[in-house]
Curated annotation (Swiss-Prot):
Subcellular compartments: Cytoplasm
Pfam families: Profilin
Function comment: Involved in male fertility. Required for manchette development and acrosome biogenesis during spermiogenesis. Binds in vitro to phospholipids, including phosphatidylinositol 3-phosphate (PtdIns(3)P), phosphatidylinositol 4,5-bisphosphate (PtdIns(4,5)P2), phosphatidylinositol 4-phosphate (PtdIns(4)P) and phosphatidic acid (PA). Contrary to other profilin family members, does not bind to actin in vitro.
Organism: Homo sapiens
GO biological process entries: acrosome assembly; flagellated sperm motility; manchette assembly; sperm flagellum assembly; spermatogenesis
Protein name: Profilin-4
Tissue-by-tissue expression: Expressed in testis, in germ cells in seminiferous tubules (at protein level). Prominently expressed in pachytene/diplotene stage spematocytes.
SUPFAM superfamilies recorded: Profilin (actin-binding protein) (SSF55770)
Lineage of producing organism: Eukaryota, Metazoa, Chordata, Craniata, Vertebrata
Key words of the record: Cytoplasm, Developmental protein, Differentiation, Lipid-binding, Spermatogenesis
GO cellular component: cell cortex
Family affiliation: Belongs to the profilin family.
Matching Gene3D superfamilies: Dynein light chain 2a, cytoplasmic (3.30.450.30)
């Protein structure tokens, strides 16, 4: 297991309020690491990278299509994108090199998912990643 994968598992999935997580390399538009069982397709990667490449207001208006579901965007700015679909959601945080992706499902607290993902994003930005 790579250092980055164990970081995802320990800091995000370890909260019990993140269902799955992944790191996407922004420049290469490719998946770097993901939690076991989290299959992020090239189409999903493009969707997330484009969500930040476009004007954040556009992502907010149009929402996000991720992993076969339409999500309503509840926050979109330079560094963060939060979207939800009923009782599930996706949190995406941008660092210098990566998009950090975390999902939550019914019964999990979105606020804990957001806090853990944003904290890991801050850590990676401070490390220059």
């Amino acid at each position: 297991m790579s250092h980055l994968q164990s970081l995802l598992l320990d800091t995000l999935l370890g909260t019990k309020h993140v269902d799955s997580a992944a790191l996407i390399k922004i420049q290469e538009r490719s998946l770097c690491v993901a939690s076991p069982g989290f299959n992020v397709t090239p189409s999903d990667v493009r969707t997330l990278v484009n969500g930040f490449a476009k004007n954040p207001l556009q992502a907010r208006r149009e929402g996000l299509y991720f992993k076969g579901k339409d999500y309503r965007c509840v926050r979109a700015d330079e560094y963060s994108l939060y979207a939800k679909n009923e009782n599930t959601g996706v949190v995406v945080v941008k660092t210098h090199l990566y998009l950090l992706v975390a999902t939550y499902t019914e019964g999990m607290y979105p606020s804990i998912c957001v806090e853990a993902t944003e904290s890991l994003g801050d850590y990676l930005r401070k490390k220059g990643s």
